């Protein structure tokens, strides 16, 4: 997990304003000096949209998105099951975040405070992982 978008209301589906979120994430990576070309995006079936796939392809990002059974048809999309198994790392991180009471429920009124708490949590998670 190298970047995140700003918080969105919980009453929308995963694809709500997804291109704006992706633009925000790519701008964050660019500002940090991280090259995004050639990276891959592992996403679950909730993000299975031809628009998302085309947007990522236009940015030279590999879309490794599990197909949503409701969207099946004549599509021939790339999907690497082995690569997708690494998504467990993201799910484990999300579960760890859910275990932190201050992060589980959004008490902050300002988006910047919510984002800052999450960045602090990610830093703590990273430091624990490298055992500093």
Residue ranges and their predicted role:
Residues 9, 46, 124:
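Short, glycine/serine-rich, charged loops/turns that create anion-binding
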Residues 1-33:
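Electropositive, glycine- and tryptophan-enriched low-complexity nucleic-acid-binding patches
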Residues 117-132:
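Charged phosphate-binding loop/patch that engages nucleotide di/tri-phosphates or the phosphate backbone
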Residues 23, 102, 125:
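Residue-level marker of positions within ordered structural domains that often coincide
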Residues 30, 35-40, 45-110:
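Helix-centered, glycine/charged polyanion-binding patches within enzymatic domains
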């Amino acid at each position: 997990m190298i970047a995140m978008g700003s918080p969105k209301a919980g009453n929308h589906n995963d694809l709500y304003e997804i291109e704006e979120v992706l633009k925000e994430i790519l701008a964050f990576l660019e500002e940090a000096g991280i090259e995004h070309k050639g990276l891959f995006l592992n996403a679950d079936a909730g993000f299975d949209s031809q628009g998302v796939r085309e947007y990522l392809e236009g940015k030279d990002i590999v879309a490794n998105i599990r197909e949503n059974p409701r969207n099946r048809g004549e599509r021939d999309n790339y999907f690497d099951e082995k690569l997708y198994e690494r998504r467990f790392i993201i799910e484990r991180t999300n579960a760890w975040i859910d275990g932190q009471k201050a992060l589980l429920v959004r008490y902050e009124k300002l988006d910047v405070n919510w984002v800052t708490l999450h960045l602090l949590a990610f830093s703590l998670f990273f430091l624990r992982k490298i055992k500093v």
